[in-house]
Amino acid sequence: MKVNKIMTVKLLLALVIVFGATSCSKKSSSKSASSATGWKINDKKGGFQFNSKYKKQATSPGLVFVEGGTFTMGKVQDDVMHDWNNTPNQQHVQSFYMDETEVTNKMYMEYLDWVKNVFSPDEENYKNIYVGACPDTLVWRNRLGYTETMTNNYLRHPAYADYPVVGVNWIQAVEFSKWRTQRVNENILEKEGYLKKDAKITEVKAESSFDTETYLNAPSKTFGGDEKIVLRGRKGSLAKPKGGKDAKQPKNVYAQRSSGLLNPEYRLPTEAEWEYAAAADVGQREYNIYKGQKKYPWSGSYTRSSKRQVKGDQLANFKQGKGDYGGIAGWSDDGADITQVVKYYPPNDFGLYDMAGNVAEWVEDVYRPIVDDEVSDFNYFRGNVYTKNKLGDDGKVEIVTAENIKYDTLPNGRIIARNAPGQIAQVPVDEKETYLRQNFSTSDNRNYRDGDKQSSRNFDLGSSDEGDKIKDNQRMYDSPKHNVTTDSLGNMVRKYDKSNKRTSLVNDDVRVYKGGSWKDRAYWLDPAQRRYFPQDMATDFIGFRCAMSRVGPKADKKKTPRTK
């Protein structure tokens, strides 16, 4: 009897061991062999090569992970201003990353320093690039207030180094985000041995600056085609081979998108992302439900802290009342008169600082009075303009040079570079991409269903020969159209639109900004509040922070009953 029991136990153990070995074998072989063909992946003899060791997206400098989900976008409080521009609707955002703080003066000064060193304003071809990147420091001026100290010192003085940058328009914020993308990815490639060490400092110049898309699409043209930089890394073909009889030349000369090394681009957050991250309802989650609705980025209905040590202190930097920007001497409520150093106030439940107060923030979206949730309730965003790489006569991508930099003269007369040497020239998508396509039919979708010809009350089915053009007197949003021209001597001539028939300030060039600021009352601290401002203008109370999309799984952690 005992013998039978022993044999039975041994048999069961043998089966468990065999089953475990089989499953382990299957698990290990799934990465080394193709599930489609059974062929070996990453064979030393050649064939399909793939990064089977990729784990997850690395968190880029300055960012905090924000797990996506569903939420109620829009204002659920009383609309005392009667704007009626943020009706509640249910939206879902994917997981993403967002800057822990607003972009500071020190961060922006690093950008200006790089631009000035690479694109010297003393050279004729580049003289407008640096000037176009500089913030407008005159935004601090007040007709009936003495603010010259901020005008002269706020951006560059070390006392304000960790204060949020202001005077930056939406276009400049976008350009900063692009620059940041290139510098971070350039640093990654250097660390991984794909670029020559320190070349980003010692050998960078206007004609040979790094661009991520150029590196991925035409790597031999990166750094102006200088192979000494691109191929001198540890993994480059020009690198010195290791000694010994088994020394071999490296295979991976260039990193590719499939390498998984390069991160997605830094960008401005969409309005939906910003509002979701600011509200941080995750702090009130219990299992799969939010217990209540937040009025501010913190819990509770008041702007003051209830913690014993700091009881009564304001949780954000905002205007307390008429003529009161921070309380009385010796007992300041929020510790600031104007802006405040970042990380001064507690973060919200996502670990993000100053999502209410300090400065309002640009987001990516073009403004419209409604959020069209009938069309989209997933990653909602208005402002898509689809482009493609420009191809030359030889069928290869065309790289921007010093001779063909495109400049835009903004309605306010400022000149800003649209591209820079080393980048791939872009053109709008055309019929080749849109023919018989259902999800989009044109390059510019900023006014889709709200300002385009089809949504206009003057839309006439019989006038298709005019295409999508709308007559000036039939625009849904009849906003002013200022004009900037150049006379025969090259002087800029600025003309104001003095028509008294204009009915709106809304057009395709006004952008949403979110959150309250040091100049706003508590009403604007609600994450659902939305306002708009021309994308080419700046103020002393609007700053910005960057975001980055998440690739791969929604989250790294498993479900928990409550957020910890």
Q: Across the structure, where does each feature detected by a protein language model lie?
A:
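Bacterial N-terminal signal peptides that target proteins for export
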Residues: 2-11
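A short glycine-rich, aromatic-capped structural motif
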Residues: 55-149, 161-184, 357, 543-544, ...
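Catalytic loop of the DD-peptidase/beta-lactamase superfamily, centered on the K-T-G motif
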Residues: 529-532, 537, 542, 548-549, ...
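Functional-site microenvironments in short loops/helix caps that host divalent-cation chemistry
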Residues: 28-43, 65-66, 72, 77, ...
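N-terminal low-complexity, Pro/Thr/Ser-rich intrinsically disordered segments
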Residues: 38-56
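Short, P/G- and charge-enriched loop/turn segments at secondary-structure junctions
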Residues: 51-53, 83-86, 500, 530-535
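Hydrophobic helical h-region of N-terminal Sec-dependent signal peptides
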Residues: 11-18
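C-terminal motif of bacterial Sec signal peptides marking the signal peptidase cleavage site
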Residues: 20-23
